[in-house]
Design a protein with these regions (language model features):
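Interface-prone segments of viral and bacterial extracellular assemblies
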Residues: 1-263
Length: 263
């Protein structure tokens, strides 16, 4: 074995069941039973550090790379996992060299830079302690002890898309609910087994305004989930879930430990 043996690098980009697989060898190869096609990929150096901001991986790729079709116009809402494996040509030894997520794509005239983030970027931080507050701090449809526990499927409205244009989408089914019913919610549909989602900014009649553009073919059935303004009234009348309300609507606005001698 030589210490200067060449390595072949395999890149696997996974979006649910959809995969884009590329190899740096100037020919198509099969690895672990999966086909990899050649792509002219140049990467940054790899750093292993306790500072997570340094454990990144940047890839310089051609602008016609099929993977980048997901980022033309608008980036996908779903995380795209990114795995770099490499194989030593002299003895076939394989190692997983880097695992993470695509953070963003930067475009230029003749190339694109894929910015990869480490796995810790997708983990939920500890965050702040829960405040004592009037509004409910719980995540709508979250499940578990002390959570919202509304079954989102009981709130779903299926709607057949009439048209989409920019940030708006139109469907007759949305008019069956009062204006604002879907504010803060989202729409969800499937394309070739891949689930797409778009947050809803506002709802008026048959029209939703979305946070990001959605290219949804006319006639597609989308699942629509209503949002929540996190007040007790909405929790009770809209979701029938006052028993799990996480705020304290009767919290006094005057501090009993303040300087006012008369409380």
């Amino acid at each position: 074995m030589s210490f200067i043996s060449r390595w072949i690098e395999f890149y696997d980009f996974a979006r649910g069941v959809q995969h884009f697989r590329y190899v740096t060898e100037n020919k198509a190869l099969v690895y672990l039973g999966q086909p990899y096609i050649y792509a002219n990929i140049k990467r940054s150096g790899l750093t292993e550090s306790g500072d997570l901001t340094r454990n990144v991986l940047d890839l310089s790729v051609p602008t016609d790379l099929p993977l980048l079709d997901l980022y033309r116009g608008t980036a996908p809402m779903q995380d795209i996992e990114m795995t770099l494996r490499r194989q030593r040509k002299s003895d076939g030894v394989v190692e997983t060299r880097w695992v993470g997520l695509i953070g963003s794509v930067e475009w230029s005239t003749n190339k694109a830079i894929i910015h990869g983030l480490p796995p810790m970027a997708s983990l939920k931080g500890l965050g702040l302690k829960r405040n004592w507050q009037k509004s409910c701090p719980l995540t709508t449809y979250g499940s578990g002890l002390g959570e919202c526990n509304v079954d989102r499927e009981t709130m779903r409205v299926n709607a057949t898309i009439i048209s989409t244009a920019g940030l708006t989408a139109t469907a007759a089914a949305w008019a069956t609910k009062p204006d604002g019913w879907f504010d803060g919610g989202w729409i969800e549909w499937s394309v070739s087994g891949i689930v797409e989602r778009r947050p809803i900014v506002s709802h008026v009649g048959t029209v939703l305004t979305l946070l990001r553009p959605a290219i949804v073919p006319d006639g597609t059935v989308v699942a629509t989930y209503p949002g929540d303004d996190h007040t007790l009234a909405t929790c009770d009348t809209k979701f029938n879930n006052a028993v799990n309300y996480g705020g304290d609507p009767f919290l006094t606005e005057k501090n009993p430990m303040g300087s006012d001698p008369i409380y």
